[in-house]
């Protein structure tokens, strides 16, 4: 038995606005400059906006910033300290929109988890489960 397949009527498929990125990049930084250590614990998400049509339609990834590159950028920028998470997200946004001319914007988010010192010890901590700071940057 043969089945005849008929082509659908002329249909135009249009690629709409899209974004992609790397979620939940865990960043834990211990600052050991003094005897009394400091800990910063973040969960960072990077979502990039731009014209990625060639990647979707032609398989051309020339204008795609790999998700591992996004993750490694988070780690690289944190190397010199994070500071306030809002400022850190601005650094991320400025980096991606400034270094890659096809990235027109994005959404960057961070959650900051806090740690309490154990018995006022210089470098022993327990996670504070009752407090999480969040920030979102959209460009």
Predicted features along the sequence, with ranges:
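N-terminal intrinsically disordered, cationic/polar leader segments
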Residues: 2-139
């Amino acid at each position: 038995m043969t089945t005849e397949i008929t082509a659908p009527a002329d249909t135009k498929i249009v690629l709409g606005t899209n974004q992609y990125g790397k979620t939940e990049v865990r960043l834990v930084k211990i600052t050991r400059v003094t005897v009394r250590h400091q800990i910063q614990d973040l969960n960072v998400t990077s979502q990039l906006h731009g014209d990625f049509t060639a990647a979707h339609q032609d398989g051309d990834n020339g204008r795609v910033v790999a998700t591992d590159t996004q993750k490694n950028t988070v780690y690289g920028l944190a190397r010199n300290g994070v500071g306030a998470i809002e400022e850190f997200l601005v650094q991320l946004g400025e980096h991606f929109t400034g270094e890659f001319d096809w990235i027109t914007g994005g959404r960057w988010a961070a959650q900051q988890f806090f740690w309490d010192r154990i018995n006022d010890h210089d470098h022993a901590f327990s996670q504070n489960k009752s407090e999480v700071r969040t920030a979102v940057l959209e460009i």
